[in-house]
From Swiss-Prot:
<feature type="modified residue" description="Phosphoserine">
    <location>
        <position position="43"/>
    </location>
</feature>
<keyword id="KW-0677">Repeat</keyword>
<dbReference type="GO" id="GO:0005634">
    <property type="term" value="C:nucleus"/>
</dbReference>
<dbReference type="InterPro" id="IPR036322">
    <property type="entry name" value="WD40_repeat_dom_sf"/>
</dbReference>
<feature type="repeat" description="WD 5">
    <location>
        <begin position="513"/>
        <end position="542"/>
    </location>
</feature>
<comment type="subunit">
    <text>Interacts with ubp9 and bun107.</text>
</comment>
<dbReference type="Pfam" id="PF12894">
    <property type="entry name" value="ANAPC4_WD40"/>
</dbReference>
<dbReference type="GO" id="GO:0051286">
    <property type="term" value="C:cell tip"/>
</dbReference>
<feature type="repeat" description="WD 2">
    <location>
        <begin position="320"/>
        <end position="361"/>
    </location>
</feature>
<feature type="repeat" description="WD 1">
    <location>
        <begin position="239"/>
        <end position="279"/>
    </location>
</feature>
<feature type="repeat" description="WD 3">
    <location>
        <begin position="362"/>
        <end position="401"/>
    </location>
</feature>
<keyword id="KW-0539">Nucleus</keyword>
<protein>
    <recommendedName>
        <fullName>UBP9-binding protein bun62</fullName>
    </recommendedName>
</protein>
<dbReference type="GO" id="GO:0005829">
    <property type="term" value="C:cytosol"/>
</dbReference>
<dbReference type="InterPro" id="IPR024977">
    <property type="entry name" value="Apc4-like_WD40_dom"/>
</dbReference>
<dbReference type="GO" id="GO:0032153">
    <property type="term" value="C:cell division site"/>
</dbReference>
<comment type="function">
    <text>Required for the ubp9 recruitment to septa and cell tips but also for its enzymatic activity at these specific locations.</text>
</comment>
Length: 543
């Protein structure tokens, strides 16, 4: 039996890989939202049955090798009081999240920015008196644990913070603290569900953290959990009312971040800029040219190079298609983006030049997740075809398919600490509750015999199937074909290739990590972290 820091005794759980055993080190169980999700009844085959959209729990980690910036108790107590407005660059007013509960009962406070929401602090339930929830607030309550002061004390062993979105709540946990399994902070949202978030590694310091959170309502929240500040963007969907699907900071920038939406838009924001009322109306006759334009597989609604003397948001805005963008990932040099869509396309986008380079298609169905290798040579994607597919970025082609999942793949990631010049470690999780580890070696990949036959017997006049042109452009069929790829200007549309033409990789490890579907997997130098849709976070000690 194993006793965890949480005091829970359980049988030792481990998974075996080539390098040794990953042993379950600890686990955290996030509670359910106080507002339960309504149950949807009816047959999934009935077109009148409402569709319940799945929002997976996602995590991000902020690590500090040393924590030598102590916050005295007096500082925390001061934060609990009403202390007006924080001031940041460009005259943008930022309200404090924390307010003294005793002095804030049903009081109204006016901030100089009319768009900033008002929030009351709600103490833990053990405190006498039920919290008063302001139904009009975007954030209904914020609860912080008493050990938040202890977590801010200096430590030579460093700090590891985990941020997680689950159901209608957002959590901040200190997983480096022994015998502590309570969230330092928990934010609850009455009318929105956080679906994704990201941490700015460029500005990360013990004095402040920049966290951005995307919601199913289209809202975006910038949040500094250390200084207790926040700002809200795309309020009530004023620019885009569809759900956020993914969100990332632009590397090397202290204020810019990218947001993708279910309507196929990708929007660049700056946290220091105000939002302008922007209404883009596209006539019905121009819809086809907007989403299926021959100069590219997208339309630039606002260019990143456009002149803006007023410095307003959005900085840039692109419409890639009418199909939801399910995820995107920056290349290590941050010049390129890989985007995956519900239509089943992988698009390689030059973020600097605002140009689509290549379009690939899944074996079938939508794509759900994407990641880039640490050296930028390979892209791994997961999808609803139960496959993990590996693409070579320099060669612009599909090089291998990883077969082993029995349901949708929900997350895929390269283990940067197990990758070198020729060997790569990939981890994936899915709705089948399984974690799969894959070892991918470039020199060990061999083309099937059927692939050699295909290359030798296909003429240069062969064309991709008509289905391959869905969501990629209003193309002229007379354009040049080279090696069965459709070239339109500088854009290459790659047809779907049969499984018999692509090498298949088998997993080195298959493990049932949880009794609920898995949503995320994450690596750090010392451990691997897995997340399940039931709110359970598990850390696995590396061999």
């Amino acid at each position: 039996m194993q006793t965890m820091s949480s005091g829970i005794a359980r049988p030792v759980l481990f998974l075996t890989a080539r390098e040794g055993e990953y042993v379950l080190k600890d686990e955290f169980q996030l509670g359910s939202s106080s507002r339960s999700t309504p149950q949807i009844t009816g047959s999934p085959l009935d077109p009148n049955t409402p569709v319940k959209r799945l929002f997976f729990m996602r995590i991000n980690i902020a690590q500090f090798s040393r924590w030598d910036y102590p916050y005295p108790r007096e500082y925390i107590e001061e934060l609990k009081k009403i202390h007006g407005v924080h001031h940041v660059e460009e005259n943008r007013d930022v309200p404090s999240i924390l307010e003294n509960y005793r002095n804030s009962k049903r009081k109204s406070h006016n901030f100089s920015s009319s768009n900033t929401p008002y929030l009351k602090l709600h103490r833990p339930a053990s405190r006498a008196g039920a919290p008063l929830i302001n139904a009009k607030s975007f954030i209904s309550s914020l609860t912080f644990h008493d050990n938040i002061v202890r977590s801010f004390q200096p430590s030579i062993h460093g700090k590891t913070f985990v941020f997680a979105n689950h159901e209608k709540s957002f959590y901040w946990l200190d997983v480096s603290a022994a015998n502590s399994h309570s969230a330092l902070l928990k934010m609850e949202f009455p009318r929105a569900s956080p679906v994704c978030h990201d941490i700015n590694s460029f500005t990360k310091s013990p004095k402040g953290l920049d966290v951005i959170i995307g919601f199913d309502t289209g809202d975006v929240l910038w949040y500094d959990p250390i200084n207790f500040k926040y700002l809200r963007f795309n309020k009530n969907g004023q620019l885009n009312s569809s759900s956020v699907t993914a969100i990332k900071w632009v590397a090397g920038k202290d204020s810019q971040f990218l947001v993708s939406f279910r309507n196929g838009w990708l929007v660049l924001y700056d946290k220091y800029r105000h939002e302008q009322p922007l209404h883009i109306v596209v006539p019905e006759k121009n819809l086809k040219s907007l989403y299926l334009s021959s100069p590219g597989t997208f339309n630039i609604l606002i260019s990143i190079n456009h002149r803006d003397d007023r410095k307003l948001n959005p900085v840039a805005c692109y419409a890639f298609s009418k199909s939801p963008i399910n995820g995107f990932c920056f290349s290590p040099d941050y010049q390129y983006l890989a985007l995956v869509s519900e239509r089943g396309t992988l698009k390689l986008f030059d973020f600097v030049k605002e140009h689509v380079l290549d379009v690939f298609h899944s074996y079938f169905a939508g794509l759900t997740c994407v990641t880039w290798s640490p050296d930028g040579k390979f892209i791994a994607i997961g999808g609803k075809d139960d496959l993990v597919s590996i693409y070579s970025f320099p060669l612009r082609k599909l090089v291998a398919r990883c077969q082993g999942h029995k349901s949708w793949v929900t997350d895929v990631i390269f283990d940067a600490w197990r990758c070198d010049d020729d060997n790569y470690r990939i981890a994936s999780v899915g709705l089948d509750r399984k974690l799969l580890l894959w070892d991918f070696s470039v020199s060990a990949i061999h083309r099937p015999k059927s692939a050699v036959y295909y290359v030798n017997h296909h003429s240069n006049n062969s064309k991709p199937a008509i289905s391959d042109f869905d969501d990629v452009g209003d193309l002229t069929m007379g354009s040049e074909i080279d090696n069965s790829n459709y070239v339109n200007g500088d854009i290459t549309i790659h047809p779907t290739l049969s499984r018999s033409l692509i090498p298949v990789i088998s997993p080195i490890t298959i493990y049932d990590v949880d009794d609920s579907p898995l949503s995320s997997v994450f690596f750090d130098p010392d451990c691997m972290i897995t997340c399940a849709t039931n709110g359970r976070i598990r850390t696995w000690q590396r061999p």
